[in-house]
């Protein structure tokens, strides 16, 4: 049983004699080790000093990554979950720290990412007094997290931490929040370590697989929709790809899920997310069988529920999800299948094979994808971002990791980069800005030998760009690619659509981003012309230090398909392009080699 009085973290009593057992902080750190944790992402706070001391004792097994902002720390843990399939772990302090970190909980919930957030808490005796930085975490996180608890007894730490990890990976994966009062961390208790959590693997019902085969045999225009990226294993993706190719089944991915399936396969037909191909959206409406595997068929994937209107589709729906609670929640499937996605892929590969009567359909969808991603439009301006992304696609190593932020800029990569079987793309499907830089740092911490590119807009970069300091602190070298169009692009697009020509609150004034990273000691590049892109990226990758490549875009080119000028013309307004920077008033900038040009001396008045 835990002693309720606080004791020094080394386990000694005030009189100098040594007490039995371990401190709560040490038990907690040991419990994380038992659950297989290798990294924790944190911003230090006095409310979890006991845990930090326990992590010091476990420093050979668990690497503590010190971040500069709690929101970024939780984003890093969320990226860990996406990249490994195992729960990422973040630690934040009470009150403000927890509030800052909540964005990562929202991302993990929307993206079905396993994550455990440990939150320092005020002493137990001060509860319900509106004490300094007191927050009721059950109420605060209850609508986003799968489970929220508080550990008040040090003896229960192994039990509750095991359960936290079990909940995070079970069914539909997601975030769990555990509050840890600071005085509990200095209590001592004699308690054995718990068991490591296990990932439940629900096998598909053979009868359901037989019915699925019958439904597939009747189809002429089937379409597979893939989702839930963190749930897939390498083996599962291999089984999935083999089954799709063997049956010539056209497969589209959900919003920011291109990493699930090799984009070079003849059955990959594109992305159903924001900024996707209108031709694919039109064809999706013609499908006579929808096979949703791991996709919740949410708002971005269905284009605001316009492609597939709930609750019942016009075409039969086979819906495969690991959590039975997700089946029938929005869409009433003709064949709901509760199964681990990897187990379903293996079973489908082994048992569901039919003579494809849709080869022409698949070929048409694939041809549309190749046209959409292969043809480089002749955009106005010196820098053709489409050509740059095609160049980047060819440059990426076979095991590259790309992280993306929220914003219109991301559509350029989605359209013009084809991800191979060993490459990964991760990003927030909920539109959370400020994700990509922390996610890229986490990726480089986890996989230091792999090339990591963090793509982010100018708006999103300045939400978490300070985490470049974290990359330097921990000796990792991601490459950040800033798409600079001097505005909150997505919001501006909506603004021009609904209130054409009435620009309000969406324009931005930016620093020299190359100088920004140079101030940290990194390598900066500025790209203003298409021909400058490849050499700049090559220099950045070879720099041996954190690097940043700024792409100075034509602000008028608001999406891959249209301009602000065209949107205003369609609204009946006189064409007036977005304001471009005045070179006479421009601040001194970095050259394409990252060196700083000298500014002209100001004239005397």
Model-derived segments and spans:
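Phosphate/pyrophosphate-binding active-site segments
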Residues: 2-19, 155, 191-193, 214, ...
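N-terminal alpha/beta PP-like core and its mobile active-site loop of ThDP/TPP-dependent enzymes
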Residues: 2-354, 360, 395-398, 470, ...
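Active-site diphosphate/adenylate-binding microenvironment
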Residues: 25-29, 33-35, 46, 51-56, ...
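Active-site nucleophile and cofactor-binding loops and adjacent substrate-binding regions
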Residues: 42-45, 64-75, 90-97, 152-153, ...
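Thiamine diphosphate
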Residues: 118, 127-133, 275, 281-284, ...
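Residues immediately flanking
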Residues: 182, 295, 406, 485, ...
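Active-site/binding-pocket entry motifs
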Residues: 184-186, 408-410, 555
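Conserved short loop/turn motifs at secondary-structure junctions
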Residues: 227-232, 378, 457-459
């Amino acid at each position: 049983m835990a002693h309720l009085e606080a004791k020094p973290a080394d386990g000694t009593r005030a009189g100098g004699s040594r007490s039995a057992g371990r401190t709560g902080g040490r038990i907690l750190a040991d419990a994380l080790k038992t659950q297989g944790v290798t990294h924790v992402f944190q911003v230090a706070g006095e409310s979890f000093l006991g845990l930090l001391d326990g992590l010091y004792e476990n420093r050979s097994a668990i690497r503590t990554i010190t971040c500069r902002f709690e929101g970024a720390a939780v984003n890093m843990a969320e990226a860990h979950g996406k990249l490994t399939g195992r729960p990422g772990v973040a630690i934040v302090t009470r009150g403000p720290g927890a509030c800052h970190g909540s964005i990562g909980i929202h991302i993990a919930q929307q993206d079905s990412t396993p994550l455990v957030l440990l939150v320092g808490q005020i002493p137990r005796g001060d509860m319900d007094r509106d004490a300094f930085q007191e927050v009721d975490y059950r109420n605060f996180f209850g609508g986003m997290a799968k489970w929220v608890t508080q550990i008040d007894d040090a003896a229960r730490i192994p039990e509750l931490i095991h359960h936290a990890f079990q909940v995070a990976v079970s069914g539909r994966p997601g975030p769990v929040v555990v509050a840890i009062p600071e005085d509990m961390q200095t209590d001592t208790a004699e308690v054995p370590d718990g068991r490591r959590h296990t990932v439940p693997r629900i096998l598909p019902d053979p009868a359901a697989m037989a019915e699925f085969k019958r439904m597939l045999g009747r189809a002429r225009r089937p379409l597979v929709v893939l989702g839930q990226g963190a749930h897939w294993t390498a083996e599962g993706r291999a089984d999935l790809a083999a089954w799709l190719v063997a049956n010539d089944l056209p497969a589209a991915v959900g919003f920011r899920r291109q990493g699930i399936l090799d984009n070079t396969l003849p059955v990959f037909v594109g992305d159903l997310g924001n900024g996707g191909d209108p031709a694919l959206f039109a064809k999706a409406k013609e499908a006579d069988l929808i096979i949703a595997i791991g996709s919740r068929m949410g708002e971005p994937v269905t284009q605001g529920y316009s492609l597939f209107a709930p609750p019942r589709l016009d075409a039969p729906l086979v819906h495969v999800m690991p959590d039975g609670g997700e089946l029938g929640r929005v869409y009433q499937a003709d064949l709901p299948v509760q199964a681990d996605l990897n187990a379903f892929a293996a079973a489908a590969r082994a048992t569901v094979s039919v003579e494809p009567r849709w080869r022409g359909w698949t070929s048409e969808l694939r041809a549309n994808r190749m046209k959409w991603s292969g043809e480089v439009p002749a955009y106005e301006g010196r820098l053709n971002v489409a050509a740059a992304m095609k160049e980047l696609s060819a440059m990426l190593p076979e095991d590259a990791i790309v992280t993306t932020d929220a914003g219109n800029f991301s559509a350029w990569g989605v359209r013009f980069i084809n991800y191979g079987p060993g490459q990964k793309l991760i990003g927030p499907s909920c539109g959370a800005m400020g994700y990509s830089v922390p996610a890229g740092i986490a990726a480089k911490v986890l996989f230091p030998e792999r090339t990591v590119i963090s793509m982010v807009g100018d708006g999103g970069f300045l939400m978490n760009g300070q985490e470049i300091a974290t990359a330097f602190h921990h000796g990792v070298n991601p490459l950040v690619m800033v798409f600079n169009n001097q505005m909150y692009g997505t919001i501006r697009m909506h603004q021009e659509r609904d209130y054409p020509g009435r620009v309000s609150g969406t324009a931005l004034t930016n620093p020299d981003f190359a100088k920004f990273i140079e101030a940290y000691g990194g390598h900066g590049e500025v790209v203003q012309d298409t021909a400058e892109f490849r050499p700049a990226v090559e220099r950045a990758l070879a720099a041996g230090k954190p690097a940043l490549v700024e792409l100075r875009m034509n602000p008028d080119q608001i999406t891959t398909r249209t301009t602000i000028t065209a949107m205003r013309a369609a609204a009946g307004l006189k064409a007036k392009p977005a304001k471009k920077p005045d070179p006479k008033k421009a601040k001194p900038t970095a050259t394409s080699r990252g060196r700083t040009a000298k500014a002209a001396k100001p004239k005397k008045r």
